[in-house]
């Protein structure tokens, strides 16, 4: 049995200092019934907690660390920038360099604005969509999480799903009434919503792969249908690629599925582990953003040199060949997890999109939030705790996916499959 005495003591102290002892709810490990692990350091595919335990890491800071922990080039870039100054409140050339890379690789983006988080990106994109179209309502999908902005924290996923809250207290009714929610992968419901409210729907916002109800890819024709119905009704299509951006493919989720939105939100990978977000799209729309247009958005640390440098060094290391290797590794892990579950007769359903993998403990195919909720949460919690004992660090929620990095080796994946085999053998009915 691993010892967690230092993590337990640190969490006891933290609970007097921060709400629930954490700065983001899912980190409290509530849904898996254990004390959170306090991490001390990471290198490559491994992380180490303050008790000295080593883990193969599939959290990767919830997705940003696509090259693993303490990537040499990212670390050197951060050192070089920090020595010259961490923030200036004035433009820097590194902003141009990262913006050029984003524009080159993301099909929908002609102009991009850097911000500080994924939430900031989605909130800003909604304001832009409303200002550009002159309409008030937005359409989102049940279980899709787009950050904690009031308009979007309605029937959301992620930590909200983990806590079992359909929405959050503090979201005014006047805000909520302008958010229309329908089931993910249900194009007919989208069409019906446009029949009812089409003249006032400014945008549809969607994750190309729903990553905060587990990993739920789009059904064939779903994204194409959203593109068609928004164009027909004069609404904008926004892809929230905070999670999928540069994660599932070289050209992001939109390149992976061949559907180009009007606006795209980015985060996670483009900051290399530092706080960052971005939103961009057609020049005609983005030129409505201040100071070139009337739609206001600003940020003290937006485009700060540290995040821009980390993001630039992260993206330049990603090539089309990187994603061929991601696919090979992800297929290997997916097949191994499936084989272990089948061997022990454990109900399961595995979804994957590129290097994002979700394993659900249910017999039901998972294509939307209702199906995701059919998972056996008690089994997941027990599985999670056993995987920790086996030295594998997974996201502590059934409703979050696993991420791979360029640092994960075949040996890491083989060890993870072996750990899952042991865990499932202990837990089988």
Curated annotation (Swiss-Prot):
Q: According to the UniProt entry, which residues carry N6-(pyridoxal phosphate)lysine? A: 268
Superkingdom, natural source: Bacteria
Pathway where it operates: Porphyrin-containing compound metabolism; protoporphyrin-IX biosynthesis; 5-aminolevulinate from L-glutamyl-tRNA(Glu): step 2/2
Localization terms from the record: Cytoplasm
Gene Ontology biological process terms in this record: protoporphyrinogen IX biosynthetic process
**Reactions performed catalytically:** (S)-4-amino-5-oxopentanoate = 5-aminolevulinate
Q: Which Gene3D superfamilies match?
A: Aspartate Aminotransferase, domain 1, Type I PLP-dependent aspartate aminotransferase-like (Major domain)
Q: Name one GO molecular function term.
A: pyridoxal phosphate binding
Q: For this protein, what is the EC number?
A: 5.4.3.8
Please give the cofactor(s) recorded in the UniProt entry for this protein.
Answer: pyridoxal 5'-phosphate
Arranged from A to Z, the UniProt key words for this protein are: Cytoplasm, Isomerase, Porphyrin biosynthesis, Pyridoxal phosphate
The keyword Nucleus belongs to this UniProt entry's keyword annotation: no
- Disulfide feature: none
An annotated GO cellular component of this protein is: cytoplasm
Supply the InterPro entries for this chain.
4pyrrol_synth_GluAld_NH2Trfase (IPR004639), Aminotrans_3 (IPR005814), Aminotrans_3_PPA_site (IPR049704), PyrdxlP-dep_Trfase (IPR015424), PyrdxlP-dep_Trfase_major (IPR015421), PyrdxlP-dep_Trfase_small (IPR015422)
Subunit annotation: Homodimer.
NCBIfam families in alphabetical order: hemL, PRK00062.1
Q: Which family does it belong to?
A: Belongs to the class-III pyridoxal-phosphate-dependent aminotransferase family. HemL subfamily.
Tell me the protein's name.
Glutamate-1-semialdehyde 2,1-aminomutase 2
- List the lineage, top down: Bacteria, Bacillati, Bacillota, Bacilli, Bacillales
């Amino acid at each position: 049995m691993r010892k967690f005495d230092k993590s337990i003591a640190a969490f006891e102290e933290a609970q007097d200092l921060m709400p629930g002892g954490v700065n983001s709810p899912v980190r409290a490990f509530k849904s898996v019934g254990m004390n959170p692990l306090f991490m001390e350091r990471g290198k490559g595919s491994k992380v180490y907690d303050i008790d000295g335990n080593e883990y193969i890491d599939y959290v990767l800071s919830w997705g940003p660390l696509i090259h693993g922990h303490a990537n040499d080039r990212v670390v050197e870039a951060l050192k070089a920038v920090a020595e010259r100054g961490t923030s200036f409140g004035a433009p820097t050339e590194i902003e141009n360099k990262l913006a050029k890379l984003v524009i080159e690789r993301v099909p929908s983006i002609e102009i991009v604005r850097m911000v500080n988080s994924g939430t900031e990106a989605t909130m800003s994109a909604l304001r832009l969509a409303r200002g550009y179209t002159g309409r008030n309502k937005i359409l989102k999908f049940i279980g899709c999480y787009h950050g904690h902005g009031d308009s979007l924290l309605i029937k959301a996923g992620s930590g909200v799903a983990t806590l079992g809250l359909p929405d959050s207290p503090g979201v005014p009714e006047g805000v909520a009434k302008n958010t229309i929610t329908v089931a993910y992968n249900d194009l007919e419901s989208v069409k019906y919503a446009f029949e009812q409210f089409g003249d006032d729907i400014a945008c549809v916002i969607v994750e190309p792969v729903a990553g905060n109800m587990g990993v739920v890819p789009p059904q064939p024709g779903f994204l194409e249908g959203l593109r068609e119905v928004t164009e027909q009704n004069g609404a904008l299509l926004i892809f929230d690629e905070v999670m999928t951006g540069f994660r599932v493919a070289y050209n992001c989720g939109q390149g992976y599925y061949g559907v180009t939105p009007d606006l795209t939100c980015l985060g996670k990978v483009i900051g290399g582990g530092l706080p960052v977000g971005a939103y961009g799209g057609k020049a005609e729309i983005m030129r409505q953003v201040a100071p070139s247009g009337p739609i206001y958005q600003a940020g003290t640390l937006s485009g700060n040199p540290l995040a821009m440098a980390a993001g630039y060094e992260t993206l330049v290391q990603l090539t089309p060949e990187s994603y061929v290797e991601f696919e090979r590794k992800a297929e290997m892990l997916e097949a191994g997890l499936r084989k272990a579950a089948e061997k022990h007769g454990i109900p399961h359903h595995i979804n994957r999109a590129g290097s994002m993998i979700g394993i659900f403990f249910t017999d039901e195919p998972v294509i939307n939030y209702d199906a995701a909720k059919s998972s056996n949460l008690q089994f997941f919690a027990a599985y999670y705790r056993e995987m920790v004992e086996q030295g594998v660090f997974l996201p502590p929620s059934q409703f979050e996916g696993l991420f791979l990095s360029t640092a994960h080796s075949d040996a890491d994946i083989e060890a993870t499959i072996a750990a899952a085999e042991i865990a499932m053998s202990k837990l089988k009915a």
